[in-house]
Structures are given as structure tokens and as C-alpha cells.
Regions:
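Conserved NTP phosphate-binding and transfer environment spanning the P-loop NTPase/kinase superfamily
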Residues: 1-108
């Protein structure tokens, strides 16, 4: 949601509306072949939800209560409420997470 908003111009509502399609694509084109890959890389970070929280919450707040995507946005905000935000300067500039929140030392 954060990356789509920041770099693709999608609202949280638009991204949430696409989640079923993304999952279908992953189930069709990724999951059946992942065990055949030479290498699998888990890019999750222990601090990623704490780092994404400050970026995601205002984007999720933009989802109107009257639309179908509101329930998911509300659920995600509730989930994020269990994490404490970390300061932006505590995310290393070389962190993969910078692809989502900006400020990467890499240029592409």
C-alpha cells in the first residue's frame, strides 16, 4: 500500500481492491514454481511494520467508510496499532525497506 501510493499513484482503496487479483497471480505464477528456484530470499525485517506504520496509517485513513475496502483498511490500521513507530532516521539508507518509504542510498 505504501509503495503503491508513493510510487504508482494508487490510493489505499485501489490497492486493497487489487489484493484478490495479486493473490491469484501469485498462486498461479509464483507458488507452483518457487520450490524449483535455485535460491529463495526472505526479505522480511523484524522492524518493518514499525517502520511502515507512520507511512501507512495516513494512507489508510483516506479510505472512505462507505466503500467495500474500508473493512480491510480498518483491520490493517488495527493491526498496525500494536506496533510503535520508529524514527525515519533509524531505517538504514541501504535497507530494502527504503524501496517502500524512500530515502534509499541506491539509485535506480
Amino acid at each position: 500500500i505504501v509503495r503503491d501510493y508513493r510510487y504508482r499513484g494508487y490510493s489505499a482503496r485501489e490497492t486493497i481492491a487489487r489484493l484478490d487479483s495479486v493473490e491469484r497471480g501469485a498462486n498461479r505464477w509464483i507458488a507452483p514454481f518457487q520450490e524449483e528456484a535455485d535460491v529463495m530470499f526472505n526479505s522480511s525485517l523484524l522492524f518493518e511494520l514499525a517502520a511502515l506504520k507512520r507511512h501507512a496509517e495516513p494512507i489508510l485513513d483516506e479510505v472512505p467508510k462507505y466503500c467495500d475496502e474500508y473493512t480491510t483498511a480498518h483491520r490493517l490500521k488495527k493491526y498496525l496499532s500494536y506496533f510503535e513507530s520508529i524514527p525515519e532516521n533509524e531505517i538504514p539508507p541501504t535497507s530494502f525497506l527504503r524501496e517502500f518509504v524512500g530515502g534509499s542510498s541506491f539509485r535506480y
